[in-house]
């Protein structure tokens, strides 16, 4: 079996001229400097906008292994923007990332991101396109003087863990079967449509029998 991914190479019996095929990594320090210079150049180019780019939504990581954690997503959904009262075309011009493919599967995620958008909108300093003729929604001259470029991520997302105090385990919790409950919940979700169809057919047959 061939070695897979980044694991240890077991019993390496080298026959070919392997010294010539060793992968080197001498460009790593220079690459680090190049990335840093590119970040600084971009920050200067987009100033006074935030250096890290537009604001991102709070999303939950996929799969059972990671879904207890939240992280930054790609862009806000169209529904979130609609509830927050921001037009999708205007959003991109004021530093809000938009992802039209994303769907909100829960009310909690929708509310959290709408709140995030409203908070961002309240903190935002909008420069007028024409300084001589500011429009409605643009920031005042005093606010513009206070504006500085944000270097870190816009409204950093943090995982908050709530600590629970120690208590006595109840009898109900002792008798609870977690694995069986999960299997049953999955089975009920999977068979929901089939059972509904069978119930409907049974009801129709009963009506026909009564006739």
UniProtKB/Swiss-Prot annotation:
- Cross-link Glycyl lysine isopeptide (Lys-Gly) (interchain with G-Cter in SUMO2): which residues? 123, 145, 174, 177
Locate the Phosphoserine modifications and list their residues: 52, 77, 106
Q: Where is this cross-link: Glycyl lysine isopeptide (Lys-Gly) (interchain with G-Cter in SUMO1)?
A: 174
Is Phosphoprotein set as a keyword in this record?
A: yes
- Output the Gene Ontology cellular-component terms: cytosol; cytosolic large ribosomal subunit
Q: Which InterPro entries match?
A: Ribosomal_eL13 (IPR001380), Ribosomal_eL13_CS (IPR018256)
Q: Which UniProt keywords apply?
A: Acetylation, Cytoplasm, Isopeptide bond, Phosphoprotein, Ribonucleoprotein, Ribosomal protein, Ubl conjugation
Please list the GO terms describing molecular function: RNA binding; structural constituent of ribosome
Annotated function: Component of the ribosome, a large ribonucleoprotein complex responsible for the synthesis of proteins in the cell. The small ribosomal subunit (SSU) binds messenger RNAs (mRNAs) and translates the encoded message by selecting cognate aminoacyl-transfer RNA (tRNA) molecules. The large subunit (LSU) contains the ribosomal catalytic site termed the peptidyl transferase center (PTC), which catalyzes the formation of peptide bonds, thereby polymerizing the amino acids delivered by tRNAs into a polypeptide chain.
User: How does the annotation summarize its subunit structure?
Assistant: Component of the 60S large ribosomal subunit (LSU).
What is this protein's name? Large ribosomal subunit protein eL13
Q: What does UniProt list as this organism's lineage?
A: Eukaryota, Metazoa, Chordata, Craniata, Vertebrata
- Encoding gene (name): RPL13
């Amino acid at each position: 079996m061939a070695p897979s991914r980044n694991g240890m190479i077991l019993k390496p019996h080298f026959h070919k001229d392997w010294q010539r095929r060793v992968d080197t990594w001498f460009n790593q320090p220079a690459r680090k400097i190049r990335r840093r210079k590119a970040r600084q150049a971009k920050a200067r180019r987009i100033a006074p906008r935030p250096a890290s780019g537009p604001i991102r939504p709070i999303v939950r990581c996929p799969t059972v292994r990671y879904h207890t954690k939240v992280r930054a997503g790609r862009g806000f959904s169209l529904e979130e923007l609609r509830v927050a009262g921001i037009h999708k075309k205007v959003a991109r011009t004021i530093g809000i990332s938009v992802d039209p493919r994303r769907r909100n599967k829960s009310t909690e995620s929708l509310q959290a991101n709408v709140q995030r958008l409203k908070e961002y909108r309240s903190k935002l300093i909008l420069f007028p396109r024409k300084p001589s003729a500011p429009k409605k929604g643009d920031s005042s001259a005093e606010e513009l003087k206070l504006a500085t470029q944000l270097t870190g991520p816009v409204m950093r997302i943090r995982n908050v863990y709530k600590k629970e105090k120690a208590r006595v385990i109840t009898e109900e919790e002792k008798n609870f079967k977690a694995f069986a409950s999960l299997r049953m919940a999955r089975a009920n979700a999977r068979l929901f449509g089939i059972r509904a169809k069978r119930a409907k057919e049974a009801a129709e047959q009963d009506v026909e029998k009564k006739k």
